[in-house]
């Protein structure tokens, strides 16, 4: 388990700062299987998880839903046959907060 996966999310208000470029570089290295995407001008973290069938993909999605509820931070999730695409960003600040990196790392632990 990574250091990030052991951290707790903090409340993220609309005036919370987005991660700086320096922080972004450091945090991205801690979650190497994730990519940074920009959609509609909003920076987001994304990863595609592969599974052998739809049932396993759905089971992972349900575990992720439980994690998101427990941490009060919710991703974009696209569940398809054999894969789940997970996208993290902080809606309130329209960009990336440290919480998104924490949740990406925690999402990776669901495979263990």
Curated annotation (Swiss-Prot):
<dbReference type="InterPro" id="IPR050376">
    <property type="entry name" value="Pterin-4-alpha-carb_dehyd"/>
</dbReference>
<protein>
    <recommendedName>
        <fullName>Putative pterin-4-alpha-carbinolamine dehydratase</fullName>
        <ecNumber>4.2.1.96</ecNumber>
    </recommendedName>
</protein>
<dbReference type="GO" id="GO:0006729">
    <property type="term" value="P:tetrahydrobiopterin biosynthetic process"/>
</dbReference>
<dbReference type="InterPro" id="IPR036428">
    <property type="entry name" value="PCD_sf"/>
</dbReference>
<comment type="similarity">
    <text>Belongs to the pterin-4-alpha-carbinolamine dehydratase family.</text>
</comment>
<dbReference type="InterPro" id="IPR001533">
    <property type="entry name" value="Pterin_deHydtase"/>
</dbReference>
<dbReference type="Pfam" id="PF01329">
    <property type="entry name" value="Pterin_4a"/>
</dbReference>
<dbReference type="GO" id="GO:0008124">
    <property type="term" value="F:4-alpha-hydroxytetrahydrobiopterin dehydratase activity"/>
</dbReference>
<keyword id="KW-0456">Lyase</keyword>
């Amino acid at each position: 388990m990574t250091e990030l996966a052991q951290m707790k999310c903090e409340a993220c208000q609309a005036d919370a700062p987005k991660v700086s470029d320096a922080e972004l570089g450091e945090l991205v290295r801690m979650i190497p299987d994730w990519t940074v995407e920009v959609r509609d001008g909003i920076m987001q973290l994304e990863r595609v998880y592969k599974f052998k069938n739809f049932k396993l993909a759905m089971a992972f999605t349900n575990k992720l839903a439980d994690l998101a509820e427990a941490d009060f931070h919710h991703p974009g999730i696209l569940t398809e046959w054999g894969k789940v695409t997970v996208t993290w960003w902080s809606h309130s600040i329209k960009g990336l907060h440290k919480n998104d990196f924490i949740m990406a790392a925690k999402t990776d632990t669901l495979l263990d």
